[in-house]
Amino acid sequence: MRILSITAQKPHSTGSGVYLTETVRGFKELGHTQAVIAGVTREDSVKLPEGVGFYPVYYNSPELPFPVCGMSDEMPYESTRYRYMKPDMVDKFEAAFGSAVLRVVKEFRPDVVICHHLYLLAAIVREKLQDMAVWGICHGTDLRQMYTNPTRAREDTPGDSRAKQDMLPACSAKDGDSELLRRRAG
């Protein structure tokens, strides 16, 4: 199977990044062909298993002139909080990741796309790839973003209703998150 994993964050520096990297490693051991799209800076050194295609989307660049967007308020590197993103930043985020997704899908031709975090990027991917299998992995902090930034999620997320309908049921709810899921998905 050809698997494309996507994250807006660095694939080594946080729990979800390590989870992505280890999932890629596990799929490689099972013999799957893979590629990864991730948001990084040009200074980052990304180490994925040999043979895994890497397609960076660069922050602190003309395309995305701000630090990496982080799901947590405190990240282990300089980051942008989603709640402070202005509409022009959201537009640049959508343009950069949206074009990368379309380019990589055309080139790599995945059977399935796995999005890490059910927030802005997952909704963009779902909107761009309406006829493809798109799986979402919930890491918990994405639920917090939806809860603490409901206006941003509702107004600035393209395809938000469809993303919630298609992807939120894939969440593994815990510690009261199931009520949040019901409110958000309904």
Question: Which positions does each model-derived feature cover?
Answer:
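N-terminal subdomain of nucleotide-sugar transferases
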Residues: 1-58
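Alpha-helix capping/helix-boundary segments
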Residues: 42, 120-121, 172-174
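Active-site proximal beta-strand in glycosyltransferases
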Residues: 112-115, 125-145, 167
